């Protein structure tokens, strides 16, 4: 059944028709964007059909449920930025389909593909709608956020994309049972801060093969972000939906319902190019976030992973193609990790005469998690930003203080670019020689730098 493993035939159009639509203001006020979902749902319910979409459950997890009345549509409206549990809903939908009921299924493209894979047959009474999905965070993320921020037992409702300030992407209201309300925006809310930089993105969502054209559903719907760049009159700040009509069956339906929209304009397909496409990468510290989430609070996990904050910054020539360098630095990294320190590995800048390598050339695969290795700096000047990443700076072993190697290694081993308020530590660093080739001025400068170390 898994659509990732069993790709079903997709004969949707490679050049779908694209429309910018607005339902009446009352519907749009209750909707995340332009009200396209409500118009499509009403079309099916008025024919005694059923609608299946995502709704909040009692524990503030999201489940796909089936509704049969217009009065139940509010359960399915508005975006829910968390993965929906499908559970047994495909099985239930098949029963409705085989009874001849008209069925509308709305979900992420992968969920639409999953339904089609499960059914293994084309039903004329099935209408599928895939959403423009950025990505869906794990329920674990939402659960921990709500529990730590409010206590789940205190929450009455969670509503994303409230529109009383306009059509904005990052508004969420958390209403508590004591009637208090917290308005969450990206500037004041840890969940929003992590979501919008793709900190929670699953690896499988990065190269989603279901997000491209031809799409999975008969229709594709979502926010028509940036439509004003092409057609300013199609954004009145109350919400505009982008609808893709992906096949002839969908076109026949759309011609029936388009008169129910307050505004319905066909636009060029290029207008929706800013919507989700394959190849969108997760935040580089995604795995670091999930590690921190297991160790501590949600808020700290977001702040530290988003901003690249670590317990220790370890500088050294650990990418040098030398068994001693690579093994001793890995050993030091592992010991620190075993002591429950989160360590960021930093190498020489690219401007060093003896520049760093990409990765660890003598290991078949890098032994470090991707989040533990900082991308190479272009110059020493750029490395000043490391002061924002930790309060402890550690220089490791090898002849890093050898005078004849100081300049070839980029002149960074004495941490003179690190603020004196930070803790500086040298572990097994050496001069590598019994004699010193430097001038008296070099001796004095090196002495000053070494005196700023807290421990050697």
Task: Name each region found by the language model.
Residues 127-148, 426, 430:
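Short, flexible loop segments at boundaries between secondary-structure elements
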Residues 1-14, 218-219:
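Iron-sulfur cluster-binding cysteine motifs and their immediate structural context
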Residues 63-91, 426-435:
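Glycine-rich phosphate-binding "P-loop"
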Residues 47-50, 153-309:
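Long, compositionally biased charged/polar accessory segments in the mid-to-C-terminal portions
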Residues 310-448:
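Aromatic- and Gly/Pro-rich donor/ligand-binding loops
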Residues 18-53:
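N-terminal, charge-rich interaction modules
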Residues 1-5, 35, 110, 201-208:
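Cysteine-centered iron-sulfur cluster-binding motifs in ferredoxin-type domains/subunits
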Residues 453-456:
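A short beta-strand/loop micro-motif in the catalytic core of glycosyltransferases
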